[in-house]
Amino acid sequence: MSATPDTRPIADTATHPTADAGTHPTADAATHPANPVARKTIISGLSIHTQMSSVAGAPVVYLLGDVADNSPIQVPEGVCLVNVGVDLWEENFSPWCAPRVFAKGPNFGDGAQKTLDTLINQVIPWAESELTDPPAYRMLVGYSLAGLFSLWAGVTQAGVSPQVARGCQPGAPAAPHVDAPATTFQRIGAVSGSFWFPGLLDYVDQQLSGGVVGLTHAYLSLGDREARTPNPQIMHVRENAELLASKLENAGITSTFELNRGNHFQNVEGRMQKALDWLVK
């Protein structure tokens, strides 16, 4: 469901000492002793933690979430992991402006394009600077609103949406951006994603009709209780997820939709692990 402070999975402060408890999912770094090259930095406000493989052509997972060292999420030996910590999710993961869906939650901004540009133009060059060869493929994976961002980025890579170009205020100038190469992220995971987000279905239709070059795999999932809500916006989340998976598959993108047990808050790390296992197989 939503990634607002009222609905995000609660971070475990015992294992995530730098996280703001109650604000982000606990989908973070993996213990990966086979990949000894680990670095940390902050790039344009994003907290970056890398564990890079020395294997030539190793795939790279860009995992959206808080940076931590003790998460049980694992990636296979020979796969690189880049954790990307992002604050202000409703601003930085939202592709275009939209009203709040909870009375106490904030409105949604239009910062996703800026976040995507930062990933492509700053984070990726820094993270992959020590690789001997380009990665075989890159994956972008996120939970909740970060999952929405992963899906949006996967179909937006070659351009910018008209919603973003307009800005949040009437008459606002177009937001500056750098068009992403069509093949930046070949695989995406949207885990318990905010598939209810207004305008998402139409936007994906628009992008797919123009041909999405480069995206080859998409993993979508939800909990089987996530649609059981009186909220008129969120109650369609499962229907939308199934439609999105079908649209992606029909566009020639290898796609799957997995229904897990529980609501939005249950087994966050287990669901993220399922996504990674599917994407790297």
In which residue ranges do the predicted regions lie?
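Non-catalytic cap/lid and distal C-terminal segments of serine-dependent acyl enzymes
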Residues: A3-P5, H32-K281
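Long, intrinsically disordered low-complexity tandem-repeat segments
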Residues: T7-H32
